[in-house]
Amino acid sequence: MSGGTSGHRTVDAVVFDWGGTLTPWHTIDLREQWLHYAEVYDPAHADELSARILSAEDAAWRAGREHQRSATLDQIFRGVGVDVDSDRHRDGLAAYHRWWEPHTHTDPDVPPLLAGLRDRGIKVGVLSNTLSTREHHEAVFRRDGVLDLVDGAVYSSEIPWTKPHPHAFRAALDAVGVDDPARAVFVGDRPFDDIHGAKEAGLRAVLVPHSAIPDSQKGHVEGEPDAVVDRLGDVLAVVDRWNA
């Protein structure tokens, strides 16, 4: 574990990325997720439909990286002609979420880490670039027993921006009731979205460098973290040092 200096400022809030941070990184077959959906929604054209959804999803993520513009699953489905009000769509979406479930489990370090932060009077936040709804993410947190440990969360599917846009970080700070970004820390696994974005927005940043991020998902700038941790649970010691 390595860290930088804190100056005289204290930490009032710690905001976490979700995928690759609160839940460990998983390398997956992106086409397979949509085959599971399409085989329920339109079995006769599952290969074609899954390819179209994957292409639309890729375009949405690319717009997020290049222009910090958010998107939703609903927009993607509508864009490829899916009837989002149909029973077969709801059944397909359920199959999609079932496929994802093994890849969404919360890191075992998270419950004691979040509880430790809150015991110290530090607010806990989440800021995630996601296409999914708040309801989906809260169901994951509830399943893993950590929903009540989160004071505020912002999902890019609910706002116009994605990380690293400073407005996304501002929204996360507002969600946990912190005015001064210098009194907040962001923890994430992506040097561009998370570390560069947080630093540009005025937060301190902690990198958890465990994710095998594809080159196509890396941004053009890598931020310089204030600390790097070997495991998520080490964040508490970093915050304690900065608050000493």
For each feature predicted by the language model, list its residue ranges.
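Asp-based, Mg2+/Mn2+-dependent phosphohydrolase catalytic module
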Residues: 1-16, 44, 111, 115-118, ...
